[in-house]
């Protein structure tokens, strides 16, 4: 069987080392592309139907509201068939100390039952926050969720050794 890299990423203003910085390509996309280069896995980007603002403050506020209301933001486009894949590398930024709720939308609409899920995230703090626990809970035992990889967005150039180690597990 084969692997697929499914990720949600955000372009726009981000906070890097406490300072605002505009990103033309989201950190999670950069990490997903690194995984693709090392594995050859198919890439699929989750895109939101209603785009997030490029202003960090507004993205953070929307993420908080979506988290608190368990919102399921709509996905733009068609969700691919995943029947030919046994492993899903699932990537996202950490927003409001967890994964964006659009990941739940994807989980509900995609055919992921029985898949191996290998989560990866980018963040400014170096941790998954509560994302790994929440993701495992949301998947409710229907999948095997492996240990994830968390990378500081501003250290993407320094993560190759950790990435290769994670991929080998």
Where are these regions (language model features)?
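Glycine-rich phosphate/pyrophosphate-binding loop and the adjoining helix
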Residues: 144-169
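Conserved strand-to-helix beginnings and helix N-cap segments that scaffold or border functional pockets
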Residues: 100-103, 129-132, 157-160
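Short, conserved loop/helix-junction motifs that constitute active-site signature segments
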Residues: 82, 108-114, 139-141
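Active-site-adjacent alpha-helix of alpha/beta-hydrolase-fold enzymes
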Residues: 26, 136-142
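N-terminal beta1-alpha1-beta2 submodule of the flavodoxin-like/Rossmannoid cofactor-binding fold
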Residues: 1-87, 97, 104, 161-168
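Solvent-exposed loop/turn segments at secondary-structure junctions
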Residues: 11-13, 49-51, 94-97, 124-127, ...
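Glycine-rich, charge-decorated loop segments at or immediately adjacent to ligand/cofactor-binding or catalytic sites
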Residues: 125-138
């Amino acid at each position: 069987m084969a692997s697929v890299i499914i990720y949600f990423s955000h372009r726009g203003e981000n906070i890097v080392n406490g300072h605002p910085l505009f990103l033309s390509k989201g950190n999670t996309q950069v990490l997903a592309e690194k995984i693709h280069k090392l594995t050859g896995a198919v890439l699929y980007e989750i895109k939101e139907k209603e785009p997030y603002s490029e202003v960090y403050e507004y993205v953070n506020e929307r993420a908080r509201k979506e988290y608190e209301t368990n919102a399921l933001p709509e996905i733009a486009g068609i969700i691919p068939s995943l029947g030919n894949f046994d492993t899903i590398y699932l990537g996202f930024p950490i927003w409001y100390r967890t994964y964006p709720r659009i990941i739940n939308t994807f989980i509900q609409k995609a055919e992921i039952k029985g898949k191996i899920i290998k989560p990866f995230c980018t963040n400014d703090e170096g941790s998954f926050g509560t994302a790994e626990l929440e993701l495992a809970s949301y998947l409710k035992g229907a999948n095997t969720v492996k240990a994830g990889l968390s990378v500081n967005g501003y250290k993407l150039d320094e993560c190759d050794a950790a990435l290769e180690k994670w991929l080998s597990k």
